[in-house]
């Protein structure tokens, strides 16, 4: 059964994810004029650059929407963001600086909650503003069909009739003006921005060129920490977790996760914390580049991982990182609610996050420059007295360590035999430049 409609389904209800921008405004008006019955759905994701959400549905009605609804997605989005922190669901990093998958998290929430609202209204055709070259077209496709199995997809930007008439921003602006709406294009920026309460993404246009740095970006969630004229005084902040959940900042307990995230954004944003420049692989395997902001997510992530390293053992931490990278890829690909992702997510939340109770104090400076000042938890397995270099009681003696080292002789002998075998087959050279044990000095295999 075909789920993607290439041409406008005249006379039928179409739900459009309506942002109020030029693209979706022109698309909604065009669909109404061509005989479709558009319904507008706007997601309140707590975008830091959106001033008046209530105005957006009103504009949609003016442009011809049969009905327009504002869906508050903030609570669910913050819940998914905290879940991603608990699981370390982040796979794009550059030299230890992380992209917190804030756009994929936003798409997971938008794609399910808007389609669920459409289904309530008897709307089974969905359109949005994603293009065929990007990730969002697949993310929305997956989340939409997961939510409504009867869903069909119509995107004006895949309809040649729409593209022929309104293929560019200039044409769309003139179309709106001719219809009596006097829509003026905003000044063109050197890049495009997409944001939600968890973070902001800046990409495309000038940022497609790698010689355009973060310095051309005007942050919307923080300060230009690279600008020496911007004063950024150092600041200490304490973050408290209970059973993996952030509950307090600087001693203030929050019962509302949305308010906690907003405060975390304010604290981190004062320093430009969480900004990163990433080259990543899109779902279609083509590489793209983005500049990201996520001050609150970064603040919570740093504190959470500090507690993880102090509470859990090495094998558990290794599994946490491995599963987190895999889960981050699933999230990026629009598979956050697939069974393989739910399995990894449940594992981390159940066995790792549940033990994370404690407080971490950080000193924030400029950008991602910070120091960990203190770590406190009743669950810490870090016990300095176990490994103290000072004289005193110890949990093990010198003789105990001699016995432990003696047991290592077994695997050391095995390794030496393998090195000898590698030398015999030519895999190892006896050259001193290899940095490996001099194979010529190994005992003859027959003598072992």
UniProtKB/Swiss-Prot annotation:
L-citrulline binds at residues 99, 135, 139, 192, 201, 203, 280. The keyword Magnesium does not apply. HAMAP family: Arg_succ_synth_type2. The gene is argG. L-aspartate binds at residues 131, 135-136. It is an enzyme of class 6 (ligase). Pathway: Amino-acid biosynthesis; L-arginine biosynthesis; L-arginine from L-ornithine and carbamoyl phosphate: step 2/3. Gene3D superfamilies: 1.10.287.400, Argininosuccinate synthetase, chain A, domain 2, HUPs. It is found in: Cytoplasm. This is Argininosuccinate synthase. It comes from the Bacteria. GO terms for molecular function: argininosuccinate synthase activity; ATP binding; protein homodimerization activity. ATP binds at residues 17-25, 43, 129, 131, 136, 194. One of its GO terms (biological process) is argininosuccinate metabolic process. Homotetramer. It catalyses: L-citrulline + L-aspartate + ATP = 2-(N(omega)-L-arginino)succinate + AMP + diphosphate + H(+). GO terms for cellular component: cytoplasm.
